[in-house]
Regions:
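Eukaryotic gene-expression regulator signature that favors modular helical reader/repeat domains
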Residues: 1-180
């Protein structure tokens, strides 16, 4: 999957194989999914794998492989695209592992070149509860985030949602600190 040419064959196989064959492929790469995702060629093959997930077993392999590596993947040039593909293709409940990790490492993610963009995509794809989970963390650290070259974009993004409750919460955090 990481070969400059072989990754294209892997992508084609995923498109045309049966669910049972796809189960075998996904299960066989499960332990290596993170390292494959971090590779410039492998990331495309993993994204294609996510595009063609067709059974619950396959989805669970993906979730299990990435669950402890979300921040590492988000902060990587190649890996962040895999997390974004999960956000786009998996349902909100299956993506909860991403939301939990991003919320737990909000400042680290929001102040990173790739992380700030992925965090915005998290907000886009979130359920109502997940959005509240993220915005609560962003709000708590908003004073720190607005002083960062990348974090400030995340706070602006929340304000651009034009949700009065979000705006009020962020405004409250800034009270007494506007002059600093």
């Amino acid at each position: 999957m990481t070969d400059p040419f072989g990754n294209y064959l892997c992508q084609k196989l995923l498109e045309h194989c049966t669910n049972a064959q796809r189960d075998l492929i996904v299960e066989s790469i499960g332990d290596d999914l993170v390292s494959i995702s971090l590779n410039m060629h492998g990331t495309r093959a993993v994204q294609k794998t996510i595009d063609f997930l067709s059974t619950r077993t396959q989805t669970l392999v993906i979730i299990q492989a990435f669950a402890e590596h979300v921040v590492e993947l988000i902060k990587d040039l190649n890996g962040n695209h895999v997390i974004q593909k999960c956000l786009h293709r998996l349902d909100a409940q299956d993506n909860q592992f991403i939301y939990d990790s991003v919320a737990a490492h909000c400042v680290d993610v929001a102040t990173h070149r790739h992380g700030c963009c992925v965090l915005q995509r998290c907000i886009d794809h979130a359920s109502h509860a997940q959005r509240l989970q993220l915005v609560r963390e962003i709000t708590m650290y908003s004073l720190t985030l607005v002083q960062d070259p990348f974090g400030n974009y995340v706070v602006q993004y929340v304000l651009d949602l034009n949700e009065p409750a979000f705006t009020a919460a962020i405004t409250h955090e800034f009270l007494g600190h506007v002059y600093q």
